[in-house]
Amino acid sequence: MTLQEKYARVILESCLKVDKNQPLFVSYNIERSDFVRIVAKIAFEMGVKDIYFDCSDPYIKHEALLNLEVDELKGLTFWNKKMWDVYAEKDAAFLMLASETPGLMKDVDPEKLSAMTKYAQETRRGFDARRDKSELAWCIAAVPTTAWAEELFKESANPVEDLWNSIFDICSIDRKSVV
């Protein structure tokens, strides 16, 4: 078992405690589709039959924010988070894979970015309310992006691998017994 597989298993079994037949909702950055495939494989092996993938591409969001007005942006599906509420009603386990792209939005109008963040939150109020009442299983787990890794490991020949190794070390993934 690779360290990424072990990390995915720890997230699903120990952090989220996903039950057989429980729906799973995975929010992630498109750059980490490789890790999401590992998560899906393990989830299916655990008996999960319903997985919703909420994929985002920060570079496409960036271009949209630079070129469209707020009303036009609201028509784009990646800011409409209604499926979060749909899966909250199904008592899904929610896995948010956090992947940063440092500095990407620095040239975006802060008011526009704020408006779209607020809109996304408005479209997932059901999820937020149930999460805030601890009625849902949810977990935020870090996965590297190239830009994030290069920002942290400027001198490294393999910054993504180094960031993965840091995550594994922080989470004790490389130890025999993680939990």
Residue locations for each model-derived region?
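Active-site bordering "gate/hinge" segments
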Residues: M1-V179
